[in-house]
Amino acid sequence: MMTRLAISGYRSLRDIRVPIGALNVVTGANGSGKSSLYRALRLLADIAQGRIIQSLASEGGLQSTLWAGPEAFSRAMKAGAQPVQGLVRKNPVSLKLGFSGTDYGYAIDLGLPLPDSLSKFSSDPEIKVESLWTGERLGRANAFAIRNGPSVRIRNDNGEWRQAYQHLASVDSMMTHCSDPRDGIELLMLRERMRDWRFYDHLRTDREAPSRRPQIGTYTPVLASDGSDLAAAVQTIREIGDAEEMDAAIADAFPGAHIEVTSSDGYFELEMYQHGLLRPLSAAELSDGTLRYLLLVAALLSPRPPALMILNEPETSLHPDLLPPLARLIAQASKRSQMVLVSHALTLVAALDAEADSRQIALEKQLGETILRDGTPPDWTWPSR
């Protein structure tokens, strides 16, 4: 389980270290940095998919995503006695992402490429350093894999360092190119775990949402990120998952209601039966809030729960009366998967805060920098270039 998250140089996250528990609720005012924290987790997941450079490019490139303030704030700047201004840099420009847990830790350092007038890709960032270690904090004795520039070394079963790569491209991660079942088994295991992280921030409920139409019926243990295969996901839960928990979650939010999946010529369609109505309502007839709740039920009750699930503002379109049932559903899901939830809804935050394993991560801005409002940041060591 992840216990520490560290981000440096990414948007408003100049240098933040966050303690992570089983159920984490990220809160804060608009512009406090919640979305940046969410995006940073997405970038970490993209490393395992080999997409980190492309993902940064889609955000406008490294220059657009880097922290826009000074490298550090002086005491006078923080006290307001001196205007905020840039100083001579002591360290190279970098964007760093990392996390650690009870078993493994990983960190990456991306920076600017050397000037090359012949290349049209000079704005692409380069991977300067990567490191994989055991435990929560990087040290000399617990590192398993180290990447410096194009060189990658991996520690074998005898504790000896082996040269795994000498010419790894600056846009390729050792996570995707150096993991093998022999000496790179730790890289392989962590890569597959990161690939399993699940993000939900764009569950569509608009009139043209695919979940409102009949869908091809096929085994679906994991709901798509946009919810397009809702009917198939619901039927999969009913056949191989916890159908009783799904029915209870529906009844908790809509007393007297239940859902069924109909099949015709290989296509599935979701129907909802509500107390007092003479016929079921199809997904096309459901309100945005009702459909969104059903999508969240299908996501949270997946028969194949991920190691980590991240929900971005799940309360969107939901009536306040649905937030307590949603909180109970999320709390149950956190017993199967580690959860990170970004939310504005005070009712949802308060309901989740009452859970025994819940940890509230309150963010705020100070001189444009995102900081933790409460608590002591965990210890963290970045690998050096």
Predicted features along the sequence, with ranges:
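Conserved P-loop NTP-binding catalytic core
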Residues: R39-P115
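Catalytic acidic motif of RecA-like/P-loop NTPases
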Residues: R11, N24, R42, S287, ...
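Electropositive, glycine-dotted interaction segments
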Residues: S94-I240, E244
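N-terminal pre-Walker A segment at the start of P-loop NTPase domains
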Residues: M1-R14
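Phosphate-binding P-loop
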Residues: D15-G21, L301-R304
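Conserved ABC ATPase signature
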Residues: D229, Q235, E239, E244, ...
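C-terminal lobe/lid and adjacent interdomain/linker elements of RecA-like ASCE P-loop ATPase modules
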Residues: P324-R385
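Phosphate-binding glycine-rich loops of NTP-binding sites
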Residues: A22-S64, Y293-V297, T347-A350
